[in-house]
Curated annotation (Swiss-Prot):
It comes from Mesoplasma florum (strain ATCC 33453 / NBRC 100688 / NCTC 11704 / L1). The gene is rplQ. GO terms for biological process: translation. Coiled coil: none annotated. GO terms for cellular component: cytosolic large ribosomal subunit. This is Large ribosomal subunit protein bL17. Part of the 50S ribosomal subunit. Contacts protein L32. Keywords: Ribonucleoprotein, Ribosomal protein. It comes from the Bacteria. GO terms for molecular function: structural constituent of ribosome. Belongs to the bacterial ribosomal protein bL17 family. InterPro entries: Ribosomal_bL17 (IPR000456), Ribosomal_bL17_sf (IPR036373). Pfam families: Ribosomal_L17 (PF01196).
Length: 119
């Protein structure tokens, strides 16, 4: 499929990467990664925030099947943070939950780097 950024890896690797990056972005709310990964990550994060805004049990289970179970703080994990803090923050916003800011290219391989953050 031409709309998927394959990044030279197999499907399992790409899915695992996106699950990890989505969970990490919810925890830290800001990541410094390559531009291609950030553009692909944006799609997955928008879906997770939309599920969190819906807020029902089925949406919570769908999000739980995608996100890694890591602690966001000593009091809450990723799923709780998504459904409480982030869902309330974006309840009046229809899409566009992330911002991508360009940085200089990476020194080792000249890959275009960006900062992706929650708006």
């Amino acid at each position: 499929m031409s709309y998927i950024q394959k990044q030279g890896k197999n499907t399992a690797w790409r899915v695992a990467l996106m699950r990890n990056l989505t969970s990490e972005l919810i925890v830290s709310e800001r990541l410094e990664i390559t531009e291609t990964r950030a553009k692909e990550l944006r799609k997955h994060l928008d879906k997770m925030v939309t599920l969190a805004k819906r807020g029902d049990l089925h949406a919570r289970r769908q999000a739980a099947s995608w996100l890694r179970n890591i602690e966001a703080s000593s009091k809450e994990d990723v799923l709780q943070k998504l459904f409480t803090t982030i869902a309330k923050k974006y309840k009046d916003r229809d899409g566009g939950y992330t911002r991508i800011l360009k940085l200089d290219n990476r020194k080792g391989d000249n890959a275009p780097m960006v900062i992706i953050e929650l708006v």
